[in-house]
Amino acid sequence: MAAITAQMVKELREMTGAGMMDCKKALVEVEGDLEKAVDWLRQKGMAKAAKKSGRATSEGLVTVALSDDGKTVAMASLLCETDFVARGDQFQDMAAKVAKSVLDNAPADAAALEALMGEEVTQLIASVGENMQLGRFARHVKPCESSLVGQYIHANGKIGVLVFLTCGKAESVDKPEVQELAKNIAMQVAAASPMALDAASLDQAAVEREREVYRQKALEEGKPANIVDKIADGAVKKFQKEVCLMEQPYIRDDKKTITDVVRETGKAVGDEITVTGFERIQLAAE
């Protein structure tokens, strides 16, 4: 059996908020597997839904760049050690330059972006005297004239969002109601941090993991075997409403879902509007 270290117990406590002895017992029960230990604690009712380990310590900036013809958009993050440096002109200029490089060069992965911008970032590190790091990035090309992108930068550049929509008619793209919808959904993604667009695009492994957690919890609580699966199914539906963008309550009116708001806007402009995807970058999640 794997040795259970104090560091493992500490990490599990940070992830779940459970007590030290409970965390140690969980790790012993699952032979040191951290992910299984989280599930074990949840099944016993000793922990809430798994949280990301550690505190947000990253500083930096998320920036967006748009092509002159408006057909391509890029978003990128540049990380540093302190907020003081993040607010400086030199750092902000470099962050904008990174996003522009993603826009112009379409790097395939982090290594490709490092090859493009790594040397310039290193020079800035030497100049400023603080460590910096290229973070996550995304690039999107509008597939047709009837598509648009909503963008939103939140919390002093610590969260950036792109939302992709398609209308049935090209003339709908420039209508104020549609433009406002795109921005509001981008704000929704920033605030509510969905995991997926809809239930169909949700990671099924995550769904089954939630189902099993609640099945085992119901069994631990002594629920009748014939209703355990119903309890688990209900928990999964609740989970989907929390993490799927189209099923989430709208932040401006929680009596409506995002699906409702999109449908209402489409009806108002006489067109069919579809949300096709989104990208979200948050510095603390780097």
Curated annotation (Swiss-Prot):
Pfam families named among the record's database cross-references: EF_TS
Gene Ontology MF, one: translation elongation factor activity
Domain of life: Bacteria
Predominant localisation class: cytoplasm
Record GO cellular component, one term: cytoplasm
Keyword tags: Cytoplasm, Elongation factor, Protein biosynthesis
Matching Gene3D superfamilies: 1.10.286.20, DNA helicase RuvA subunit, C-terminal domain, Elongation factor Ts, dimerisation domain
Region (Involved in Mg(2+) ion dislocation from EF-Tu): 82-85
Localization in the cell: Cytoplasm
Role noted for this protein: Associates with the EF-Tu.GDP complex and induces the exchange of GDP to GTP. It remains bound to the aminoacyl-tRNA.EF-Tu.GTP complex up to the GTP hydrolysis stage on the ribosome.
Family, similarity comment: Belongs to the EF-Ts family.
Protein name: Elongation factor Ts
Organism: Desulfovibrio desulfuricans (strain ATCC 27774 / DSM 6949 / MB)
Organism phylogeny: Bacteria, Pseudomonadati, Thermodesulfobacteriota, Desulfovibrionia, Desulfovibrionales
